[in-house]
Structure formats: structure tokens, C-alpha cells
Amino acid sequence: SGDGSGKPKGIIKETPADGQAIESAAPGYADLIAAEAALPLAYENDAVWCMSKKTFMQYYGLVDETGQPLGRVNYGLAGKPERFLLGRPVVVCDYLPSFTSAISTGEVFAFLFNFKDYILNTNYAMGLKKYEDNATDDIVTKAIMIVDGKVVDKNSLVVIKKSA
């Protein structure tokens, strides 16, 4: 979620392509359908949903007109939850706000994206410094690395924002 000034530019700070920003007053089935429709066919293969766990649970609790749940949680071979919405994997993270009435109008709370379209640029040189802090007797390890990053193809990005 960085703004690109002194830190990598975050995915949700990128301006999506025309027609790829969906506005929603509350999580609903129509949001998911509109976002899926806005994702160009050429970018569909590796795109995943990204949202907070609380937002996922709001979508997960929705049912279609026949009473079938929209979300699916399966337990893979390792016993870890595997989350899906409309057949597409969901990555849950704490870096996006959960949908509540408290989030600001225009704030992104979920998005579809192919993470291969984000590039982290680095010189692969990490400086390590280890020293003892004499005031606290703690051993401190400090690592410094020069990195930058940004979305290189925003056509796979579809955001869902809170509407007024």
C-alpha cells in the first residue's frame, strides 16, 4: 500500500484501467460478478482475489438464489484452509481494510490481480550490521537493502471500492 515515494508503490495505489474499478455500498454477489466481468479475458488465468479475512467471511456468507454459498473453503492435503470465491483462489491479508461502515468512501477493500504483474526491483545486495547496544546490552542485527516495486501491467487489476 506504499505510495511509491521512498517505498515501493503498492498494488492498491495503482490506478486501474478504465472500467476496472467497481463501487460497492456493501459486499454482495453483484460486486463479484461485476469484478469478474471487468477482468479482461487475456488476464483471467492467474488472477486471484485479495481481501481481509473479515471481508472474505462477509462474501463467504452470501448465498445465491438457490441457497448455495458463494464462497468455498476446502482443506488441502496439508489440512490448511484453501479459500475460493466463484472458483477463484482468495488470498487473505491484513494490509487491506475490512469492509465496515467505518471505511472511507473510495477506499479499496478487495481486488482481483495477477501477482505476476507486480515487479519488485532490487540490487540483491543486502547490507548486514550486527552490534551490541551498550545502553540495553541487546545484540542488534540491522539489514539494509535497496528495493523498489510497482505494478507493471495494470490490466489484470480490478478493485472494489466503497461507494457513498
Please provide the spans of the model-predicted regions.
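Long, contiguous amphipathic alpha-helices that act as assembly "spine/axial" helices in icosahedral shell
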Residues: S1-P16, L39-C50, K54-F56, P89-V91, ...
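Extracytoplasmic/periplasmic cell wall- or extracellular glycan-interacting regions that localize
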Residues: G10, S24, A47-C50, Y59, ...
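Alpha-helix N-cap/loop-to-helix boundary motif
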Residues: S24-P27, D31, Y43, M51, ...
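Short, conserved, surface-exposed binding loops centered on an aromatic residue
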Residues: A37-A42, G79-R83
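Alpha-helical scaffold segments that mediate packing/assembly in large oligomeric complexes
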Residues: S1-A37, V159-A164
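Short active-site loop/helix that positions an aromatic residue
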Residues: F56-T66
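Sequence/fold signature of self-assembling virion shell proteins
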Residues: A26-P27, E65-A164
